[in-house]
Swiss-Prot record:
It comes from the Eukaryota. It comes from Xenopus tropicalis. Belongs to the TMEM231 family. Keywords: Cell membrane, Cell projection, Cilium, Cilium biogenesis/degradation, Glycoprotein, Membrane, Transmembrane, Transmembrane helix. InterPro entries: TMEM231 (IPR019306). The chain crosses the membrane at residues 23-43, 263-283. Part of the tectonic-like complex (also named B9 complex). It is found in: Cell projection, Cilium membrane. This is Transmembrane protein 231. The keyword Transmembrane applies.
Amino acid sequence: MALYEVYSHPALLRYRSSICSKATLFILIVLLLTYIPPLLVAFRSYGFWLKTSTYEEQPNVRFQYDVLLIALSSTTGNYLAWSTYPGFNNLVGDKLRLPHISAREEDRNQDGKMDLLNFQLELPLQPTDNIYGVQLILTFSYQLSKMSTFIMQSMALIQYSSPIPGSQLYMNGDLKLQQRQPLNHRGLDTTYNVSVINRSSPFASTYALTNIISSYQERNVTTVLNAPNPLWIVGRAASDPFVIKAVIRYPVESISYVPGFWEMLKYAWIQYVSILLIFLWVFERIKIFVFQNQVLTTVSGPIPSLYKSHQS
């Protein structure tokens, strides 16, 4: 009658040797070569320790209703101006022109965070006035909270000029975050939670655009208005105001941050284990070859059966 294999299992052998033997030394060397080189390979391949990482978050942005406007009324340097800063308005004297401003923020997806700002400024003009360019600063409160809590006062600069006088400037863009250094992974950071412009200052240098921009760019974290297609509309009736319309969106940002210890360890462990598995497989085959073929002298024998041990 033909016989068929119904079950099989490997026979385990035990290889014994004294402590002071070549076999023991071989095992120690194999252990060192199995676990240390993967660590060196992972470390030397760079990126072993995760120095920076990124995550996505929509910031909590709110318009602060602080505005500084300079409208160029000629190509030779004349201008009209207005701001929400009393010190600046006192300094511009007869160049002050009071505009009409409307601003509305929208939360389109109803998640509790504003998604965009609709801003409109109407600057009244005399029939003989012309506008050749504008420089407009809007300020915002900007907050991140998914990892660390980061709070700052930021700004958007709207700037455009043309040799042809205009009736309207239309901007549609994103308020983008710019980082020179990553944020912390936890804690509270209010380093830049200070006004972009000191509203209590009476000095003209405080309101000079070069000084404002220079001071702002010293920050490691800023916002900038990215509006690649500004629209300058010409042709204004004598009684019409000059109009600035801006749609400023608050997009989801990719935030760079310094990961914590456990996150760095998790990332390093994944790299180490992926290389270690290869070394374990290779040196396991080497050990099988050495001991099965008695390259090094050992005493071999089967491992006692657990069932027989209980019977005895």
